[in-house]
Curated annotation (Swiss-Prot):
GO terms for cellular component: cytoplasm. The keyword Cytoplasm applies. Its EC number is 1.2.1.38. This is N-acetyl-gamma-glutamyl-phosphate reductase. Keywords: Amino-acid biosynthesis, Arginine biosynthesis, Cytoplasm, NADP, Oxidoreductase. SUPFAM superfamilies: Glyceraldehyde-3-phosphate dehydrogenase-like, C-terminal domain (SSF55347), NAD(P)-binding Rossmann-fold domains (SSF51735). PANTHER family: N-ACETYL-GAMMA-GLUTAMYL-PHOSPHATE REDUCTASE, CHLOROPLASTIC-RELATED, N-ACETYL-GAMMA-GLUTAMYL-PHOSPHATE REDUCTASE, CHLOROPLASTIC-RELATED-RELATED. The active site is at 156. It comes from Aeromonas salmonicida (strain A449). Catalyzes the NADPH-dependent reduction of N-acetyl-5-glutamyl phosphate to yield N-acetyl-L-glutamate 5-semialdehyde.
């Protein structure tokens, strides 16, 4: 059993990680940590997340000097569900002691220091780790994940978008010069637990945000190898992302070629389901799956992708990366 530590366990993604680690046959939940100054320190995990009363009642430990010493000397791997700049500070400390780090923040996803000052509001000081980090898009990057010590788990919108677009891009089916258009909606849990007016019960409404400046647009483009036009929306529901993507196909591309591109890409990869009918949030909420379907008319293609933003868009994809890194079946503990 691998002693597994979660830092940032009070948040939504951290909570999902805790439940997945608890149920994983090869992992032991060794510690749930929050920042030393957190108001949640010493509270029971289940007092914040009552769905796990009686199942996960461990205390949330402060990440103070004693906590760091315990992790550095006794843990086998670390999951970071922390703010981007916090992950950028903590990851090198764990890596220096030989601990594999699986980071759910955006701190190591894009190999460009300027990206972080432009889109994340902090100066990234560790170019070497940016180069060493493996992007944890599990179905597409397993060799790099297995070889790396630092795995940058993709963002939720990028996961939904890249799973839908990479089969087409890899097969060379997208028209030259065409920017795929991604229209995506996420539940309010994507904004985290911190209270805000626009995500409060009486205020939340389907609405666009982040036009031309959302940090996930360059992440998608970087890992697709192609510029995209990305418009996210806040949805008035708890969890899940639905991405509707518009793509112009290269001249002469047939529906059979499109079908074969998706079938080849996801053969033997059970956590991506090619549903044959347009997916829905209901079909993926609280599951580790990405559901994809598509329809072609002439040279235009509509691809729809659905995931749970807290699972396939965060915690369960991190579990896939752990499974790949340690040689387990990628779906272990998930299905």
């Amino acid at each position: 059993m691998l002693n597994t530590v979660i830092v940032g366990a009070s948040g939504y993604a951290g909570a999902e990680l805790a439940a997945l680690v608890q149920n994983h046959p090869q992992l032991k939940l060794f510690g749930l940590y929050v920042s030393a100054g957190s108001q949640d320190a010493h509270k029971r995990f289940s007092s914040l997340h009552p769905q796990w009363v009686g199942a996960l009642d461990q205390p949330l430990l402060p990440l103070d000097e004693d906590g760091m010493t315990r992790i550095l000397t006794q843990a086998d791997l670390v999951l970071l569900a922390t703010a981007h700049e916090v992950s950028a500070e903590l990851a090198p400390k764990f890596l220096a002691k030989g601990l594999p780090v699986f980071d759910l923040s955006g701190a190591f996803r894009v190999k460009d220091q300027q990206f972080y000052s432009s889109f994340y509001g902090f100066t990234h000081e560790n170019e070497q780790l940016l180069e060493q980090a493996a992007y944890g898009l599990a179905e597409w990057n397993s060799d790099a994940i297995a070889a790396a010590q630092l795995i940058a788990v993709p963002g939720c919108y990028p996961t939904a978008s890249l799973c839908a677009l990479k089969p087409l891009q890899q097969a060379g089916l997208i028209a030259e010069g065409w920017q795929p258009i991604i229209n995506a909606v996420s539940g309010v849990s994507g904004a985290g637990r911190k209270a805000a007016i626009n995500t409060s019960f009486c205020e939340v409404s389907l609405s666009p945000y982040g036009t031309f400046n959302h940090r996930h647009q360059p992440e998608i483009s970087h890992h697709l190898g192609k510029e995209v036009l990305f418009q996210p929306h806040l949805g008035n529901y708890v969890r899940g992302i639905l991405a509707t993507i518009y793509v112009q196909m290269a001249d002469g591309v047939t529906p059979t070629q499109v079908d074969q591109a998706f079938l080849k890409a996801y053969e033997g990869k059970p956590l991506v389901r090619l549903t044959g009918q347009m997916p829905s949030i209901r079909g993926v909420a609280s599951t580790p799956y990405c559901d994809i379907a598509w329809q072609q008319q002439g040279n235009m293609l509509v691809v729809v992708s659905a995931i749970d933003n807290l699972l396939k868009g965060a915690a369960s994809q991190a579990m896939q990366c752990i499974n790949i890194k340690f040689g387990f079946d990628p779906a272990t503990g998930l299905i």
